[in-house]
């Protein structure tokens, strides 16, 4: 303290002032400063402690005082801290550094120490890089495989007894009359107002042939028996009356099976009447054939029309007994029969045989006295020898025959609709079952053959001679001009008025409709055409042999005579002149242009014969006129949109014959027809005849041309002018599908849409026909010939059936063709056409088909309803008519596994019925389904009388048992790894309806549906494909759209569409709460949930609605991408919360515009609008914030076959192409060359599966679906694997394997990164061997590198990979070529590439013992003749691949598998350095193999060959102007 002065200031604080000597000293400034600070601190503390305390400021008692005290404290402390920091950083720290650096240190160590230090540093760095930088693959977030979704099996709410009382009665009654289709309220009341009920006590019998009406069981159980054919027949009334009178004798008779056999048991809500008996009730007063003799004079027609009452039984008795007579004999026989007025007594028929009953002698005028007797006989002939017995006390309801007769008179259009519905179900239930399932082809085909006797009408005599020769000359000249190739398509005669009709058809139709509305009933019932000149017939002096006098006179007769004065009005006379003027002009034109009018007269004559053949004659029109005074309460007859017929007609040889384009709205058309009907008495006949005259086409087909193919919907009616048509059936060689109902009937590699256009020579080797003939090896069996004057396709075209036969031109044939659209217009305006067909069908029905029709039950089940449960007694076989069923196996532990799914045309339950065992699984309906129930009692009855049926069903069962036996071992378990494959295999087959549902509002489902529809058309769906949206449905329903009947009408319309088309797309383009969205969900076999990939993956409102409906249909997710790229992990985010997606997912590239508004915007609500806006904003923000590798796609599908919509279309219709790549180490590089050859050949790949190196190459191709990135990445990986340094650095102590597997993991991870299998553009899977559970596993989700690495893990070389506690090794140890699993995924054609090593099978003769020394010496001895024994490693390898070799041999024989093995045996497993060489070998082999397939015609691809280009040109054939 001597060097400074300390003083105290006025505040009581000490201050220190350094002395001048200390301040001037610069040697130790820091020391001086520190001393000064220390002295100051000591002095201050000493002074403060000894001096009296100064008066301190008062302690603050307020908040302001505390704040001031804190501020004063901080103003003193903070400056001192800052001062210390500054001094330390500027003075103290530099001083320390200067002292440290001025020091000198010396370290001494030897080289060993230095080396150890360096090794430690290097090891530390390498460990950090190896385990913290290069093994990023091990630090990925865990993403386990996605579990297979559980099977949805909701409780059956409809199980158990029905509701008691009145509700039970109504429910059972309504379920029974569903067979009539939708009924309007007046029609329903008309049917039920005279309904009667009847009580049957247990054991009471009922003679069904004596019951005059439609019978159904309301409560109880009734057994239906049939008289056995083996014990003789009982036809007389006395026997039947005695049988029905003595119930006790009858009971004993039936119980003892004395001559009767049980057909079926009828329970609550089922009908006791067959479909044919219902038709007979509607068609009592319908003629079988037109009375041609009465058509010679108009007066006779007028007289007969005046005498015809409301109900006349005028049906010939002996028409069915006459064989194929000459055409001139038909008129005489028929006229005599019709004059007699007796109805036919249809006898019991054996398999096509007929018995001739005696003809009646009553006269036509005595019909009133004989009506009851005739009706009773007719009813007996409709269902003879049928007896019903009540098992318990039963209540039945009977709708009497009088109700049906009155319904026919009061509501003829509704009657025709009911008849059409019954005819449709008759074909779907009875005919289809008998033909396809029971093998009763002769009985079914015999119906069409016998129908020709009713439809044969000859052309007039003067049109057969010189006129026909002139017609032939025109075609011969044109044929010579065109050449043989073009002629094979058929030549149509030029129709100059066809174009004018199409342009003005809508106007002409409305004009003629209004015209007919004002005409008298007499005039309206007359058909007038522009070519007919009524007044000038005698003026021109035409001879009686002229054409106009031979055309049906009834068309002109009423115009010659004076009508009754009370019916004639001046207005009608004025209106009639409107039609007479063109008639006079046409007559003069015939004088001037004989050739042109002769063609028109040919069309007139052909149309006359066709209309008489289908029952549209003058007498039927007159009879219809009396009762056709209603119609406002009847819906439109046709149950499908006629405008959609265009898509079908363009696919046949008559694509140029457009359907009626001017019809406009279908409902408007129906209303116009009904209003005209009620006003004028008939439909607008004049306009209809004019339209049909222009629709008639005269076509020439050369010998061998195919006019109609089996299974095709009839294009129309063919009237044979000259030549012969051969009707036959193709005979499939043995070894093919026996029945055709157990497998989808799709020919591989063919295009049915093109196949329908092969109207050329079917024997020729062109295009699809040649491929099909080679593939199926069919021969043909001729059934009967259609001669000139005959009509082909009557039943099929009028009733819209599919053809059971092929129709081939036996000779050069000239036919008149009337399109099916024209027939639909006829049936719509003249229901008598359908009634006539129904009458003819009931008259020629064989007894066997009648009994089958009685026993077959039409069953309708709701979505989710259980048909039978596992363990129930098997009482019936079920055939799917419409809808879809799923069979579910309930295993111990309440685990459910899908056994199979059954679509339209398939059957289930034969094995249990034949073996009388219990049901092996539970069967439930996926959606609303129509079934044909084939009871076991009917099967037993048929088996006793017709063993051929038993043989047919036994073949089906044997085929299914063979499939079960040959099912691979890998599919017999129900483990997680393969349960999904079984479900997928059955779910992708025979899909008939696909629902397209958006995830949320704003998804462009309409555009998506249109593109998918276009792709399905190009892929070629059997029988075509159509799409439905709300606009199409509203257009069809019209005024019934929002009524209860509209639902029934809609269900029938949708059922007809599913029968008509091979696939129907339901596009849900409405809001969530609309009924159409619900319909799309309930009608779908498969539901496609469409979402935008870049939008929010949250659950959408449509999905919530879908879940609320509890549908069990297959659900698939479709993600729409703006670019052909999927970021890693995107798909997993979508699938994570959607456990209900049980059908996989698809990535589709589709350019679209993001919009927040749906296609049909719903009601504007603030919450909904706000949510949509937020979603759009999220999507827009995600565009710029998401990490994406590239903003534009590097690889796009430039070839159409690689289009995403085509891939989805092939998956939906079961025509996917699979690629299976086998394992083999470096030999797998050949896979790259084979894939390139496939792309160059134009073969699309939809599913890829691989093993070992095949999984690596397959994953590369599935990622981008392009060869270019696959080639680059594969070559880079081969370079890494070919480096010996990497292999050497990865060596480890061989406790588990020789290497650690790190370098192998790195090579695979650098190739795939963090991508997941779900993100791949193509569907991909790889297989591994689970050595922990000793089973194969298939992986289709999770990290790619992980499961590809597991599939490539050779035992001993690389350690197994751990997955959920299990160890996975190379999948090739069990199955090196997974063709069977690929088949289970739904692939139709599979390319299997095998690159595995071939074992040395040289016989070994080294003896019973072996010395190792001798083995080594023998291996090095060049002169030894003994083969080298296998080494220990070779023996272990052969043991490991024993199972794989067995599966490989089985895979080669799987149908649809194309086995390929490139010549790569000379390359080793680890020779990755020979990449280019092995790649070229595979590429060359692939090109050679595919060229061979192409030359053989078995290349399954949509290739544009010259033959198919010719076929495509026939889609729009040219009209020959001759």
Curated annotation (Swiss-Prot):
Q: Quote the record's binding site residues for a nucleoside 3',5'-cyclic phosphate 2.
A: 840-960
| Catalysed reactions listed for this entry | a 1-acyl-sn-glycero-3-phosphocholine + H2O = sn-glycerol 3-phosphocholine + a fatty acid + H(+)
> Which InterPro entries does the record cross-reference, listed alphabetically?
Acyl_Trfase/lysoPLipase, cNMP-bd_dom, cNMP-bd_dom_sf, LysoPLipase_patatin_CS, NTE, NTE1_P-loop_dom, PNPLA_dom, RmlC-like_jellyroll
Keywords in alphabetical order: Endoplasmic reticulum, Hydrolase, Lipid degradation, Lipid metabolism, Membrane, Repeat, Transmembrane, Transmembrane helix
- Any ranges marked Cytoplasmic in the topology annotation, and which? 1-65, 130-1522
Residue numbers covered by motif GXSXG: 1250-1254
Q: How does it sit in the membrane?
A: Multi-pass membrane protein
Stretches with biased composition (Low complexity): 15-24
GO annotation, cellular component aspect = endoplasmic reticulum; endoplasmic reticulum membrane
Q: Where does a nucleoside 3',5'-cyclic phosphate 1 bind?
A: 680-800
Q: Name the segments for region: Disordered.
A: 1-24, 308-384, 523-544, 757-776, 1501-1522
Activity regulation, in the record's words, is: Inhibited by organophosphorus esters.
- Family to which this protein belongs: Belongs to the NTE family.
Q: What is this protein called?
A: Lysophospholipase nte1
